[in-house]
Design a protein with these regions (language model features):
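NAD(P)-dependent short-chain dehydrogenase/reductase
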Residues: 136-183, 190, 196
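C-terminal amphipathic/interface module of NAD(P)-dependent oxidoreductases
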Residues: 217, 234, 252-281
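NAD(P)H-binding glycine-rich loop region in Rossmannoid oxidoreductase-like domains
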Residues: 42-79
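Mid/C-terminal beta-alpha module of Rossmann-like enzyme folds, strongest
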Residues: 12, 171, 201-247, 252
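Glycine-rich Rossmann NAD(P)(H)-binding loop
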Residues: 177-182, 209-216, 264
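Catalytic helix-loop patch of NAD(P)-dependent Rossmann-fold dehydrogenases
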Residues: 78, 82-86, 106-148, 153
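N-terminal Rossmann NAD(P)H-binding glycine-rich loop of SDR-like oxidoreductase domains
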Residues: 3-22
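NAD(P)-cofactor binding segment of oxidoreductase domains
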Residues: 71-99
Length: 281
């Protein structure tokens, strides 16, 4: 029986994989939280990998506090860069497989067309820099790795934009949401299923892939969709990102082109509204 290690087990994606795992009991699933797969302690992480001895690693764990990363660069790079390289090296040396999760924040937002896997990377914040460094080391240490870049992840688990909007729309009569950052949300349950479909596929084709739900929207439009599905009475006002300054810059355009993953792994990618409906169901 093949053993799958899921890092970041209590996060959005790890939690969705946990839900799906019961339907795939041909695998032994190991769900490791930050104490069982210590991505911020490389020496300990190495011994944990040896002890678990996985055949497949889903590296869902990451340092994702985008604004905080600006002042915690060392920690962000340890988790998002150095730990990734260590996992990739372990996987190569032990003839295992790795799916590593990355981000749209490796891009600078200057594009006006959906970004494919070959698009020029140029992160504009520490979080994006650390994730790009992780991608580079991942493929350097193990060229057979699969990296999936995703964006705007949400789920019924953990903290995310959808749950924040639900709370604010219940508490307030009016909220402001930025309307000049464009991309597409990712329902973590869809991404989790895509990852399982990849390991179930007869072929393992390494490299970088993009995955998010279909549709091109702003955060404001996403908030309007949440309002509509939730039946909230709160007024949503679109504002420019310049009116909502944050320590870390965000890319203004980071829509991901999903043609490669759809073609190579024959995946159907749902529209964001369809997936948002599933979360509300």
């Amino acid at each position: 029986m093949k053993k799958i290690l899921v890092t970041g087990a209590t996060g959005q994606l790890g939690s969705e994989l946990s839900v799906l795992s019961s339907s795939y009991n041909q695998y032994e699933w190991i769900f490791a939280d930050r104490t069982q797969a210590t991505l911020d302690d490389l020496e300990l992480l190495e011994s944990q990998l040896k002890e678990i001895n996985p055949n497949i690693v889903f590296n869902c764990g990451a340092y994702t506090a985008v604004d905080k990363a600006e002042s915690e660069k060392y920690l962000a790079f340890t988790v998002n860069h150095l730990a990734v390289g260590l996992i990739a090296k372990y996987v190569r040396e032990n003839n295992a497989k790795l799916i590593h999760i990355s981000t749209d924040y490796v891009f600078d937002g200057s594009s006006s067309v959906a970004l494919d896997e070959e698009a020029k990377t140029n992160p504009i914040n520490v979080y994006g820099e650390s994730k790009l460094a992780g991608e580079i080391d991942c493929l350097k240490e193990n060229s057979e790795s699969i990296i999936i870049r995703t964006s705007w992840v949400y789920s019924k688990f953990g903290n995310n934009f959808v749950k924040t909007m639900q709370r604010l729309m219940q508490e307030r009569d009016e909220i402001n949401v930025v309307n000049d950052q464009i991309g597409s949300p990712t329902y973590a349950a869809d991404l989790a299923q895509a990852m399982i479909n990849i390991i179930e596929s007869p072929e393992w084709i390494s490299g970088i892939y993009n995955y998010s739900n279909e549709g091109e929207i702003s955060w404001y439009e996403f908030a309007e969709s949440i309002k509509e599905l939730g039946g909230y009475n709160c007024k949503v006002r679109g504002i420019p990102s310049s009116s909502y300054p944050t320590p870390a810059k965000r890319p203004s355009y980071s829509l991901l082109n999903k043609e490669k993953i759809k073609t190579v792994y024959n995946l159907e990618v749902p529209n964001y509204k369809e997936s948002l409906r599933k979360m509300f169901a």
